[in-house]
Amino acid sequence: MRPEIKPSGQKGRSFIEEARRAQIIAAAIEVIADLGFARASLARIAERAGISKGVISYHFTGKNELMEEVVNQVYTSIADHVIVRMDGVGTATGLLRTHILSVTEHMRGNRTQLKALGEIFSNLRTDDGQPRYGIHTNEELYRSLEAIYRLGQESGEFRRFDVRVMAITHSSAIDNMFAYWIVHPDHDLDAHARELADLFERAVS
């Protein structure tokens, strides 16, 4: 994550500044989910937030930085939720299942965030035209999932397998579950997650 630096160049932010940034990020999520990435201009986001475009420019250097902060904040909220659910789980099998179910639980209650993430991941580009997000930005996630699978192998709960392959498959399965749910909102997301957890439990034993 980027350094916490105010537009003035001073480190740290006041409570009011943090609240304003949160307001802008929340408005950005709504506009992106409703209108799509291309139509989510800073002017529209400012209008949704009930502020001037200049206020956004004070807190963010431009649309790209705001989009990156949306991703940072959403992923932080997911991680916070999952960590609470996984706290105290004593087995690798339990951690595996809890990870899948807790991520699902969080996103079920935050569908708008999920739609916004999908738009950003599909459209945000770096200055040289390359996708900002993708497999190349998933390393931290893969390593955290590998830790669960490695723990299971060390404890004897899981059979031997390539933990990187399993981590990639695990992540992809969750991503595709959510992608299907966005297109088919009546799909039973919780049932899908339970089936997925069952599938991975069988795959590692």
What are these regions (language model features)?
Residues 1-19:
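N-terminal intrinsically disordered/low-complexity leader segments
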Residues 20-29, 45, 66, 70-74, ...:
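Generic hydrophobic, amphipathic alpha-helix propensity
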Residues 24-32, 103, 200:
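Short hydrophobic clusters on alpha-helical segments that form packing/core surfaces
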Residues 69, 83-113, 166-170, 193:
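Hydrophobic alpha-helical connector segments
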Residues 94, 132-138, 153-169, 190-191:
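All-alpha amphipathic helical-bundle segments outside canonical DNA-binding/catalytic cores
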Residues 104-147, 154:
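Short secondary-structure transition hinges
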Residues 105-109, 147, 151-154, 160, ...:
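Amphipathic C-terminal alpha-helical segment
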